[in-house]
């Protein structure tokens, strides 16, 4: 693994919405120190385990990702996501979006897509109680 700089996460990497970064930077409950090497090693290790494991089969899965996510780049997460791909898998990669896709400038579009996906895979209440 390449050397990890001893710097905190830049709020600019989270979203194209400047308010998201400002809120992150001013939140006293957010850890603002550098990312620990062990955390990153565990993340990469988890991606590798998922990439070798079983998929989700028929479990409905929606993967949303920002095309410009520098914290979890597509090329790093792609092997695990491809392994999880199952019968009801849908992928939405948003051009220009960064790490916090649900807090992006097009958040309404993203939330609408999540709601649409949930509606498409939800079991009606009457069928669920049978």
Identify the function of each model-found stretch:
Residues 35, 73-76, 106-107:
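Residues at alpha-helix caps and immediate loop-helix transition turns in enzyme cores, especially N-
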Residues 88-130:
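Catalytic active-site module of serine/aspartate enzymes centered on a nucleophile-bearing elbow/loop
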Residues 57, 63-65, 69:
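Short beta-strand/loop motif that positions the catalytic acidic residue
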Residues 59, 73-83:
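Short alpha-helix in the alpha/beta-hydrolase fold that links the catalytic acid
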Residues 31, 68-72, 100:
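Acidic catalytic loop of the alpha/beta-hydrolase fold
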Residues 1-35:
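Alpha/beta-hydrolase-fold enzymes
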Residues 35-53:
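Active-site nucleophile elbow and catalytic-triad environment of alpha/beta-hydrolase enzymes
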């Amino acid at each position: 693994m390449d050397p990890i700089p001893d710097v905190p996460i830049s709020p600019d990497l989270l979203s194209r919405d400047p308010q998201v970064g400002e809120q992150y930077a001013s939140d006293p409950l957010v850890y603002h120190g550098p990312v620990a090497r062990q955390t990153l090693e565990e993340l990469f290790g988890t991606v590798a385990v998922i990439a070798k494991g079983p998929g989700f089969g028929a479990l409905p899965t929606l993967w949303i990702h920002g095309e410009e996510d520098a914290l979890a780049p597509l090329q790093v997460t792609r092997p695990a996501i491809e392994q999880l791909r199952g019968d009801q898998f849908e992928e939405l990669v948003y051009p220009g979006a960064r790490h916090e896709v649900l807090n992006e400038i097009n958040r309404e579009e993203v939330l609408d897509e999540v709601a649409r996906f949930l509606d498409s895979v939800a079991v009606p209440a009457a069928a669920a109680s049978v």
